[in-house]
Amino acid sequence: MLRQCARWVLTRTRFGRGCRRYGSCSPSASGDAGEARAYFTTPIFYVNAAPHIGHLYSALLADALCRHRRLRVPGSASTRFSTGTDEHGLKIQQAAATAGLAPIELCDRVSAQFLQLFREADISSTDFIRTTEARHRVAVQHFWGVLEARGLLYKGIYEGWYCASDECFLPEAKVTRQVGPSGDPCPVSLESGHPVSWTKEENYIFKLSQFREPLQRWLGNNPQAITPEPFHQAVLQWLEEELPDLSVSRRSSHLHWGIPVPGDDSQTIYVWLDALVNYLTVVGYPDADFKSWWPATSHIIGKDILKFHAIYWPALLLGAGLRPPHRIYVHSHWTVSGQKMSKSLGNVVDPRTCLDRYTVDGFRYFLLRQGVPNWDCDYYDEKVVKLLDSELADALGGLLNRCTAYRINPSGTYPSFCAACFPSEPGLTGPSVRVQAEDYALVTAVATLPKLVAGYYNDFQIYKALEAVSSCVRQTNGFVQRHAPWKLNWESPEDAPWLGTVLHVALECLRVFGTLLQPVTPNLADKLLSRLGVSTTERGLGELYFLPRFYGHPCPFEGRKLGPDTGLLFPRLDQSRTRLVKAHRT
């Protein structure tokens, strides 16, 4: 395996620097499949309540995917990332009335909370869209006009179960009965558990029934369109059932806080259709330039809105003559001590408190390290402290401190690598050879780590990418512990070459870890790489040529002065910061 790894690096070296890129050599690992542009989106978040950690988790997943793509494909012009707020609908209309505010006043207030949270959490979005913006109204009404011109909308009586909380109609199969507070049967949504009522009114209706087979073909031809796989299969299963036509408007007398149907002020466009079009608004729809970004789109969404994004939205796009999005990444939810977050339970965790308590990078790392898209993840404060102290403070921070401490590295430089001490061929012997079999396993693991991590990002398994990095950090600590550089003497002709080699290998490993952690912990990674003396132009995946001296090539860092010591990489969370994060009660 080591010889294969060496050949992999050396082959690319013969063709020049640009071919030594771990992240961009393999399209399957990059996730871009050769596309020149990439457009990442979060859902736009409903402004009926303050943001919670589930909202932040969606934004962090998108942010990490986007940042990793920027490491692979330098140049901000090729990557776009949007988030924002969903501000129309009956719930906003009612919440504003209850608060004694105009709807736009409520929207301004809560949208600002989301914007502030994302700034504090270092979400690197390029666009923040609000559905109350004039540009969005233009896009929605144009999109409606295209559907109408294509004969896909008709006016009729729509009758069925309506869920006010979810603002959607439900077929009979998606409704069940539960015993209500009065002891009587109460109809509720099977999917959300929210109450439903029978509603009959005249609406505009979209011919969704025409798109069942086109959607099945789309998913059949694009097996990675929806990730993870269980959600892809769930959508295929939904499509085995009949797709009834879909109401896409409400009476203006009932819902006035929204975008009017063009040419018919008696109807307001349904909030979920209005909201979905935001992805087109951001890239300039209906102007022709939007096609340079569409459909190179990756939607990051929660599982509760899967049907809207994986059935309704692709059908609407196909109906408008547009291609469905490139990828839909789906994640599950966060619970608190095993319970769903709820204002009524008083267990909604305030993400801004967590960012302050555990640091921005610490809380980013926790959510992305512990969050598994396939199933719900449980939050409790002790878990945060244990993870961050173990992996960031002790393992990673301790490794950096060991290798840069004055006692072990008095010159404050990137020491030289001695090929005689650490030959590239395992099993060689000689008076200078001190390497052990486990050390070759470490080199192989770290050399292949960037490609492994790229594959995990492509598969929407960021938690596995961080698990792989953490595993290599542990291996590197084992390497340092095994060879105990603090017991070696720089003044000894026998010790000095091996001491320099041990530190060189460990610092090279740290450089890889710092580079790969940039999408998740940008500030911590910057601090680590700056301490190693790695300039900002040497931090992309194209520059991540690991341990070149091992393969007989020059190392640009050898002999370079380390950067300034700015203190602990990540201080352990002391008792004053381990108090339970109080629930944000509203």
UniProtKB/Swiss-Prot annotation:
Motif extent ('HIGH' region): 45-55
EC numbers for this chain: 6.1.1.10
GO cellular component entries: mitochondrial matrix; mitochondrion
Catalytic activity, as annotated: tRNA(Met) + L-methionine + ATP = L-methionyl-tRNA(Met) + AMP + diphosphate
Pfam families (alphabetical): Anticodon_3, tRNA-synt_1g
Transit peptide feature range: 1-46
Keywords for this protein: Aminoacyl-tRNA synthetase, ATP-binding, Ligase, Mitochondrion, Nucleotide-binding, Protein biosynthesis, Transit peptide
Molecular function per GO: ATP binding; methionine-tRNA ligase activity
A GO biological-process term: methionyl-tRNA aminoacylation
Domain of life according to the entry: Eukaryota
Subcellular location(s) per record: Mitochondrion matrix
Listed InterPro entries: Anticodon_Met, Met-tRNA_synth, Met-tRNA_synth_2, Methionyl/Leucyl_tRNA_Synth, MetRS_core, Rossmann-like_a/b/a_fold, tRNAsynth_Ia_anticodon-bd
Binding site for ATP: 343
Residue numbers covered by motif 'KMSKS' region: 340-344
Family, per entry: Belongs to the class-I aminoacyl-tRNA synthetase family.
Protein name: Methionine--tRNA ligase, mitochondrial
High-level lineage: Eukaryota, Metazoa, Chordata, Craniata, Vertebrata
Gene assigned in the entry: Mars2
